[in-house]
Amino acid sequence: MELKRLGVSWRFLMVLVLILQSLSALDFDPYRVLGVSRTASQADIKKAYKKLAREWHPDKNKDPGAEDRFIQISKAYEILSNEEKRTNYDHYGDAGENQGYQKQQREHRFRHFHENFYFDESFFHFPFNAERRDSGDEKYLLHFSHYVNEVLPESFKRPYLIKITSDWCFSCIHIEPVWKEVVQELEGLGVGIGVVHAGYERRLAHHLGAHSTPSILGVISGKITFFHNAVVHENLRQFVESLLPGNLVEKVTNKNYVRFLSGWQQENKPHALLFGQTPAVPLMYKLTAFAYKDYVSFGYVYVGLRGVEEMTRQYNVNLYTPTMLIFKEHINKPADVIQARGLKKQVIEDFIAQNKYLLASRLTSQRLFHELCPVKRSHRQRKYCVVLLTAETNKVSKPFEAFLSFALANTQDTVRFVHVYSNRQQEFASTLLPDMEAFQGKSGVSILERRNTAGRVVFKTLEDPWTGSESDKFVLLGYLDQLRKDPAFLSSEAVLPDLTDELAPVFFLRWLYSVSDYLSDFWESLLHSNWREMMPLLSLIFSALFILFGTVMVQAFSDSNEERESHPADKEEVPEKAGKTEPSFTKESSSKIPKKGFVEVTELTDVTYTSNLVRLRPGHMNVVLILSNSTKTSLLQKFALEVYTFTGSSSLHFSFLTLDKHREWLEYLLEFAQDAAPIPNQYDKHFMERDYTGYVLALNGHKKYFCLFKPLKTVDEETVASCDPDSSRGKPSCGLGPKPLKGKLSKLSLWMERLLEGSLQRFYIPSWPELD
């Protein structure tokens, strides 16, 4: 009887506990957690989430309940940011099996109840559930939007180590202790940590290419690399180190330190030197070098190496304490020094951040210009830039040395000193210098203030060129004093053009780097037999090979057919009548050109010269054929055939110019063409005999340049050219037949393709000459 009463009591207690747990679970309201109404829009929900996440993030809020509060905020945002889960919650009070926070809490507490009262603890303490197993992973959990918007951009400054896990994963449990130990060490060094639950974030796991759990991968500069070795502490540490580029830190010795420190002028960066007691470069220093690779060049000196005594003695370095030096324009004396027995990452980063620019940096890109000369936000945040416009030299010039010494003596928070190579940034320099001719070959100094991001600036330029004399320094100092008293002292206003990126790699190098990355990815996939990821690449390669093979075969057969057809065509060719002037298509070409097709070719005369060239609309070009009265018919026919396929472009116009009438105009243009045939003078006896027939000029009237096509000389033409010129006074013994005239324009279609591609050389002229 007592046993029955005891059993009833236990059952009643179980039911009571379950009811209480359910009621407590109902307290979780995502709308109340985020502080929004049930009719709130997605924008309001996102805004509230960002505000609360910043306030309750465990790294920023030291409140003991901050972590639990942050988890509730994240769960609430997961429910309300997904329309389907939000609808489920509004109708049923639950967001689904994957996201129901109250369900997870209920299951957790229900299991806890059974563990204490009914079942063996050794069974139910086995950590199958990911959330129960490691609550420390909660703050590292990644969602797809978080990965795309934050992790990927941040990976260009620091590498990320990401673990892919799931529920009911025995191997995940096995690697957990090693993972915790590695995370604790690497996170302190600056490595980003992430955890992806494959059950809840299938889209992100698929995006990362993780098809099994557990998986560990690294993300750096947007590139994903998988870890394939045994999960031990040393292997994971080496894996993170292998993600970093190999040329981040240069080993500096007594033999190369002068060359290393002298690179500031070419690289336009300060140089950092760390003196350490270990032969290998510390990982923390490599991570710092990666974060600031765009601003500072890093070197490492092992103090235990023979021959470094001269360096340590010159810079007064303590051999028993880690020391970091920053060098700028002067290599004999460091600009800043930090020395501590235990250099922490935050201390190093603050030290580098304060010294990431030279004393007078060179403006090599628009991004650097925005950073050094920011747009003013208020009257108290005015930033002025003193710009030295000077010519590029191999050695430091006297004007620049004087400018540097002036900058060192007049360093202020509101004034930044920079310099520009005027020969590399000509448009930028010409905007600031009022009279370029007066400053030709000389240096000038301007003081400017940016007003908006569109390039609008106000500035004041020193009237005389900058020589670095004491009088120049006195004048510049007076300008700065007047500027502090009256900001309206900068009286000139202009819109500066964007700076060209001087240090950007050329196209060939970018292409080479891309090919190298593809090859390394392919080799890694091949080694580890990741065929699922390799299939798109293999499909692309085989498709390209198939297309290439098909193109070669088609070209081979078409060439052989053309050769067979060309022989009878040559035999049937009949010279054209001399009196025919209109272009007509031959029988051979009629198969290639539609019957109703025609090419409109107008003559370039003094009447049509202005409309067809001088006032031609921007973006339009006039393709002009040079011919003579005797070659007009034949050349126009061939010209029409060659350019017919390009007549679909409305920006191309076609004309011809008679050499007998306008020879002087043509020879004036050819004087501006590089590698063109030398232009004879009027006293040369062969002056009027030079043959320009078959030349084609593509004239851009708006931008005042032209491209030149010169026909290749055939064997018959060379024979004609070798004839005695005196024979031309009598009956000529040799002349141009139809074959040479036909061959003059044989390569014109290829030239036209290059013209449309924009790969032809352009010859600029100051103005279009008169057409007499």
Swiss-Prot record:
It is a single-pass type IV membrane protein. Residues 26-533 are cytoplasmic. The chain crosses the membrane at residues 534-554. Residues 560-591 are annotated as: Disordered. Residues 29-93 form the J domain. Residues 1-25 form the signal peptide. It is found in: Endoplasmic reticulum membrane. Residues 555-772 are extracellular. Glycans are attached at residue 629. GO terms for biological process: regulation of autophagosome size. One of its GO terms (cellular component) is endoplasmic reticulum membrane. Residues 561-580 have a biased composition (Basic and acidic residues). It comes from the Eukaryota. The keyword Endoplasmic reticulum applies. InterPro entries: DnaJ_C16_autophagy_reg, DnaJ_domain, DnaJ_domain_CS, DNAJC16_TRX, J_dom_sf, Thioredoxin-like_sf, Thioredoxin_domain. Plays an important role in regulating the size of autophagosomes during the formation process. This is DnaJ homolog subfamily C member 16. It comes from Mus musculus (Mouse). The gene is Dnajc16.
